[in-house]
Amino acid sequence: MLCAVAVFCTSPLFAQSDSLSFRNAQFTSSRVADSWKKFNDTLSKEFKHKNVAYPPKDIYLRAFKSQNEMELWARNNESSEYKLIKTYRICAISGSLGPKRVQGDRQVPEGYYFIEDFNNKSDYYLSLQLNYPNYSDQMQGNQKTGGDIYIHGGCVTVGCMPMTDPGIQEIYTLCLNARLNGQLYIPVHIYPTRMNKSGLSYLNKEYANDATKQQFWSELKAGYEYFEKYHKLLPVMYTPDGKYVE
């Protein structure tokens, strides 16, 4: 038995009304309006250079903790491959490699998430909330898993991913564009490192005696390798006890 992440459709009229309300609420913030004005044209040119439509219809963020990097991928439709648009620098990372399992451990989570909230009144300029804890975190973690994991501005973190204020201005504008263009679920996948030959060698060497982390990383490795080969995402699926599966 497997559990899968499902996306439910709404009527076009409701979706249009909801999108308009969401847009109006977002642009009450001068931070959002200023960010849009500053970065929207630049993003449009970068997408055009990659032959990807803008505003985007489908974007994907992929982060690597060891490298302090977050990649932006995009595609024109569900049948096409994602293209790498650019790579952002994560300003700081707290905790160690491995998933977040308990509240207050200062860990940046690892696994498969999506953006569930746009916070235009953040203490860190702007922020994008992830759906942590997801099903895997809830089943595999402590009863008190914590929450409030964001991609945000600034350069201070106790478990989030700070991108600097200019960085979050651009990323927020990008994600807001995708949301307003119909993408309700923007995937954000977080890995301990690039899971290529050298990355896996490092994990096997440094965490050879940590069977729990090794098992978890083997689950993430399958999704990483599939995307590297096809530039497409697998559906996020779990076993009843919270393990990721293809």
Which residue ranges define each predicted feature?
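Hydrophobic transmembrane alpha-helices
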Residues: 190-192
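Cell wall/extracellular polymer interaction/catalysis modules
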Residues: 16-158, 166-186, 195-246
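Bacterial Sec-dependent N-terminal signal peptides
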Residues: 1-19
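A conserved hydrophobic position in a structured secondary element of the catalytic/binding core
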Residues: 163
